[in-house]
Amino acid sequence: MRTYTPKPGDINRQWHVIDATDVVLGRLASQTATLLRGKHKPTFASHMDMGDFVIIINAEKVALTGAKLEQKRAYRHSGYPGGLTSVNYAELLESNPVRAVEKAIKGMLPKNSLAAQQLGKLKVYAGPEHPHAAQQPKTFEITQVAQ
């Protein structure tokens, strides 16, 4: 029997909406990365973009365990000498919670050219509203261990 290779027309993309309220950031990122890559599908191929669209709402209410809120830092560099800036996650979640969630998910995607396409299917919103109701997204529940 020959190995099945999916064609671009065979890819069926769905829309999922995830509520990030009180969900641990790492668990949210790993589940979202699986959906974006399409690893939950039986027709998964690592060399193709098979993933679904993912909408994350309430990114401002995401949880971090332990002392990560104060100790974990996010770094950026402007490209100029001495242009390294860092901010802890408490300040990052207060100023731009969308960036904190996107950064965690981007770190769990493969480091190749497909990552940009897969990250393009991610829509993150700080509040409970999103403009994608016309796509009829399905609710995706993340099983949470008690904190």
From Swiss-Prot:
Keywords: Ribonucleoprotein, Ribosomal protein. CDD domains: Ribosomal_L13. GO terms for molecular function: mRNA binding; structural constituent of ribosome. The keyword Ligase does not apply. It comes from the Bacteria. InterPro entries: Ribosomal_uL13 (IPR005822), Ribosomal_uL13_bac-type (IPR005823), Ribosomal_uL13_sf (IPR036899). The keyword Ribonucleoprotein applies. One of its GO terms (cellular component) is cytosolic large ribosomal subunit. Pfam families: Ribosomal_L13. Gene3D superfamilies: Ribosomal protein L13 (3.90.1180.10). One of its GO terms (biological process) is translation. This protein is one of the early assembly proteins of the 50S ribosomal subunit, although it is not seen to bind rRNA by itself. It is important during the early stages of 50S assembly. Belongs to the universal ribosomal protein uL13 family. HAMAP family: Ribosomal_uL13. Part of the 50S ribosomal subunit. PANTHER family: LARGE RIBOSOMAL SUBUNIT PROTEIN UL13M (PTHR11545:SF2), RIBOSOMAL PROTEIN L13 (PTHR11545). This is Large ribosomal subunit protein uL13. It comes from Paenarthrobacter aurescens (strain TC1). The gene is rplM.
